[in-house]
Design a protein with these regions (language model features):
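Extracytoplasmic/periplasmic substrate-binding proteins
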Residues: 95-96, 202-219, 246-396
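Helix-loop-helix "hinge/cap" segment bordering the ligand-binding cleft or interdomain interface
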Residues: 107, 132-206, 220-273, 326-335, ...
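Conserved small-residue motifs centered on glycine
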Residues: 31-32, 342-462
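Short alpha-helical segments and helix-capping/turn motifs at coil-helix boundaries
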Residues: 66-73, 89-92, 124-126, 175-185, ...
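Bacterial N-terminal signal peptides
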Residues: 7-17
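Conserved N-terminal structural module of periplasmic/extracytoplasmic solute-binding proteins
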Residues: 20-173, 207, 216-221, 226-233, ...
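Loop/turn elements at helix/coil->beta-strand transitions in domains of secreted/extracellular proteins
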Residues: 23-27, 52-56, 77-82, 102-104, ...
């Protein structure tokens, strides 16, 4: 009798376990894709259920204000979902949600439930440092990649060829090349509409800084060889950078409305959209600024600095945090983590990026993959119903080996050149170097000082303020008073 009762109890426990595993978890997040995408009926979630055995009842929120309002309500105790996917959490939001008890610390769950992510973090301990808070807690899961796309300075090499000019190796050679572009009808439309340095505002102009030996980030700080952080405008190379921009402005290389107009706005106002007007651009890919047919006319420009070193700034790095979180309302955090772990395995991650082979994409005889589109199913249909990585950033390990084999010569060309730039790129300030209070103060200082940096550069370049020793020192002095020295002191204390 006792044996029968024991067997019955065991059976009931097993049935309860099965029921718990079969219970669908509720999932929500921010969806910013431009095409309509309904998570409730999206193929991705059913395919993930087939891969993991974990079912998600998904609902995407398209209005960012509504989504941020939901996050604020979570901090106040109103939790309406078990999982946040494409969560778009800032570090401040992560900390607030954790401290309020709205989301749980994922650190204790990773090793047991996420073998794929565990292996990646073991191989790249620096990645773990980025996702951990200063107390060791982990609020969210990241997107990881070994090949982060690079912002590049692209130069119109076709125009260089037409002018009989080699790829510039120095800033002086670059200036000479751009001056020659300004005086030639290189697009052949009979108009003087060429823009040699088609740069939009100070942000894009700052991507020229590595040519002057300055690798600076959005805090306007640079790192010396000994690891010490300095305020970038204090460096000699920074003044040379501003001096060169002033020269370009006077020579007509930099357009008069460089600080007020969008890319090629003046020229394109009177031209066909297929007309190439740009000599030098800053972009991840040329086709974001110029006609797609002209992509192969552009090559990334890397110029050695005065010390002979070729260096670049890696904008994003290999880790993007805030992508996936588990709420305190989740009845089965382990299952949520197992579901999430599938996207840290390359083959499984392809489901999010390209769908299923034979249904959404296929591979040709040359080994390149392509989407299966026809008169009845467009690429927008696939974006809407099959893939989900576009829009807000999702967690997982980007399947670069697969994506790099796309059946698009333009995309492969851009990816190959991005990899070349990545090889000489470096991060300036790693996020894990900063504690909560330090980061908050740095952001406050960077906002006020950054505005003064941009305004000062614009005034020097346009000639509103003459570039003299006195004016330069006065500008630097004003930024010291605004907190530039405190900015670098905070960073150096956090090393």
């Amino acid at each position: 009798m006792k044996k029968a009762v024991l067997c019955m109890v065991t059976l009931l426990l097993c049935l309860c376990a099965i029921a718990a595993q079969a219970q669908a978890l509720t999932l929500t997040g921010l969806e910013t894709e431009s095409v309509a995408r309904e998570w409730e009926n999206h193929a991705f979630f059913e395919r993930m259920r087939e891969l993991t055995g974990v079912e998600m009842e998904a609902h995407g929120i398209e209005d960012e204000a509504e989504y941020r309002k939901m996050l604020a309500a979570m901090e106040g105790g109103t939790i309406t979902a078990d999982v946040l996917f494409k969560a778009s959490l800032s570090r401040e939001e992560e900390i607030g949600l954790l401290n309020s008890g709205a989301i749980i610390d994922l650190a204790p769950l990773i090793e047991e439930n996420m073998p794929n992510l565990s292996a990646l973090l073991s191989a790249h301990p620096e990645w773990k440092q980025v996702i951990e808070l200063e107390d060791g807690r982990i609020a969210s899961l990241p997107q990881l990649t070994q090949e982060p796309r690079q912002v590049c300075v692209w130069i119109n090499s076709a125009w260089l060829g037409s002018l009989g000019i080699d790829m510039p190796r120095t800033v002086d050679e670059l200036t000479q090349a751009l001056v020659k572009m300004a005086g030639a009808d290189l697009n052949g439309n009979g108009k003087a509409d060429e823009i040699p340095a088609d740069l939009l505002g100070v942000y894009e102009m700052r991507w020229l800084l590595p040519f002057f030996g300055v690798i600076a980030d959005d805090y306007n700080v640079a790192r010396e060889d000994d690891g010490t952080w300095v305020f970038a405008p204090e460096l000699a190379g920074y003044r040379e950078f501003v001096k060169t921009l002033r020269e370009w402005y006077e020579l007509g290389v930099l357009p008069r409305k460089a600080f007020t107009e969008s890319h090629g706005a003046i020229a394109l106002a009177g031209n066909d959209n297929d007309t190439v007007v740009s000599g030098l651009i800053v972009a991840v890919a040329p086709y974001t600024n110029v006609p797609g047919s002209a992509v192969f006319d552009y090559a990334p420009l890397l110029i050695a600095d005065p010390d002979g070193q070729t260096r670049w700034r890696d904008l994003l790095g290999g880790v993007w945090t805030g992508c996936f979180a588990v709420t305190s309302a989740c009845p089965d955090p382990a299952s949520a983590m197992r579901w999430a772990d599938a996207l840290y395995e390359q083959e499984s991650a392809i489901v999010a990026y390209a769908g299923v082979q034979g249904e959404d994409y296929d591979i040709n005889a040359d080994g390149y993959w392509y989407f299966l589109v026809d008169n009845y199913r467009t690429i927008n249909d696939i974006r809407s119903n099959a893939i989900i990585y576009t829009g807000e950033t999702m967690h997982g390990f980007v399947p670069n080996a697969f994506l790099n084999r796309v059946d698009s010569e333009q995309d492969r060309y851009v990816l190959e050149n991005s990899a070349k730039v990545l090889a000489v790129s470096e991060r300036v300030v790693e996020p894990y170097a900063l504690g909560e209070q330090t980061r908050a103060r740095l952001n406050e200082l960077a906002a006020s000082i950054g505005s003064e940096v941009d305004k000062g550069i614009a005034r020097f370049v346009t000639g509103e303020m003459e570039l003299t020793d006195e004016n330069w020192e006065s500008w630097l002095s004003g930024m010291r008073e605004a907190g530039s020295e405190e900015l670098t002191a905070l960073l150096n204390a956090a090393k």
